[in-house]
Amino acid sequence: MSARSKARKRALDVLFASDVRGEDAVAALDRAIAEGEGPTNDYTATLVRGVVEHQARIDELLSSYSHGWALDRMPAVDRNVLRLGVWELLYADDVPDAVAVSEAMALVTDLSTDESPQFVNGILGSIVRNKPSLA
């Protein structure tokens, strides 16, 4: 697993745990770093902070593209994988779209339900197709 793949997994861990606990993800990240339990890859912090900074817009897009699925009805893993994927698609200029989608698919395939990969791929694919109008 590449360093960036590990960073994505760790960012997902932070976002997922914070989502389930109802706590601020950046505060959880900062606390983990202060306690020496934080990520060793700076990209993890970049991902978590980026998702939190743009979460309102990301969630708006996810609500719009997830026809018939409210965010709170999605499995928490799927919701947070999608947040990571959308952040990389829209805000990480150094990450090719295909890599962002592929990495999101790898996470959701390993960690969520059998139906989740198709769901996540469909949403991220729609966002990629409409990306020029979303910027």
Curated annotation (Swiss-Prot):
GO molecular function, one term: RNA binding
A Pfam family annotated for this UniProt entry: NusB
GO CC terms, sorted: cytosol
GO biological process: DNA-templated transcription termination; transcription antitermination
PANTHER family: ANTITERMINATION NUSB DOMAIN-CONTAINING PROTEIN (PTHR11078:SF3), N UTILIZATION SUBSTANCE PROTEIN B-RELATED (PTHR11078)
Alphabetical list of HAMAP family matching this protein: NusB
Functional description taken from the UniProt entry: Involved in transcription antitermination. Required for transcription of ribosomal RNA (rRNA) genes. Binds specifically to the boxA antiterminator sequence of the ribosomal RNA (rrn) operons.
Protein name (database record): Transcription antitermination protein NusB
